[in-house]
Amino acid sequence: MSSTKQEKYGYPRVSLYALMLAAAGIPLYIHLPRFASVELGIGLAALGSLLLALRVIDLVQDPLIGWAIDRFPKAQSLFAISAAAGLALGFPLLFSVTGQGGMLRLTVVLILLFSAYSLGMILLYARSATLAKSPTAPDLMRLAAWREGGMLTGVILAAMLPALLVGMGAAGEGYGAFGWALGGVAVVAAVISYPIWQRPVIKGDKPSLQGLAQAGALKLLLLALVNSLPVAITSTLFLFFVEDRLMLTGQAGPLLVLFFLSAGLSVPLWTRLANRVGGRQALLIAMPLAIGSFVGAAFLAPGQVMGFAVICLASGAALGADLVILPALFSVSLTNAGLNAALAFGVWSFAGKLALALAAFFVLPLLQAAGFQPGEANAPEALTMLTIAYAVVPCVLKLFALALVLTLPTKEAVA
């Protein structure tokens, strides 16, 4: 396949595969707390503990997945189809779980979903050099823009789909139909994206701690973990903050779409900026935007929908920079060092999921201890704790991430 055709037809297929995977990431953490508490009667503290416990599996599983992808490069088509099949089966099963034995069934299905998600994500990111037009910094950044654009489109669709399905006549809160719809998307994405997994794999050396450190990848891994925590916390608490703290009943869906739409539209802009001034400088521009958004959210009064809409636009734009620049910097560091990427991206994948699990593990029990009850009349103390968890804690974490960015080299490969 010529490089022109590869870019014309390959990047949209990459974007579609990313769209499929996105539904098992942030949207799952957005919908799962409400589904588990309302439909299954599972407490927030119990759910938070379960999600963190599942990360113990990832601690072993994700590096093993990365090792297998590096070890068996000719099996990448099988890996890609297996990941899609796991999602196609897991989504309908997840949202058909009922209260009878719900915790056990939920655990089993989440293991299936998270395993499929890990396999697909690690494969997609590890094959950046293979899927890009060329393994150079500008083309890796361009691939990242297509990939993250697909991710954000998937997040938007998955975030708003339950409400749309209810409007079309789906029963209850639309979760049953939601599961089947996502399963169908996985099947379609697997078929259409299949050709990209037929390309010869660009191989490198086996990564080691010393090699990762010399490439600057270990520092980027720490930055990725810390930087993922703020959005993990706000994603987990978004529905609660909008409906219970701001009292904007029925507005969570449109505001969530606005947030991720802003992120998606900002991706091409951050890509151009990073290629012009460097990834480090672009992040230093984006992160204060996120910090200002968290500060603004802390001072909003109930009913201030326009104020929160502005915050969604600003914080969404800042998220776009995080999503496109950090993975590209990591991929460039590995490629320049001549290292195989799959095992390294296995650790990268674990860091991102650990952030989501840590957010659920710490903030959900914290809210429950403060007496917060979703959808109920809450005491001022409970709502204050919700504000601290949603806005103040992420602000502090983002400041820490900003400090880590300042330690990056002033001249990196993405420039």
Question: What positions do the PLM features span?
Answer:
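Membrane-embedded alpha-helical bundles of multi-pass transporters/translocases
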Residues: S2-A415
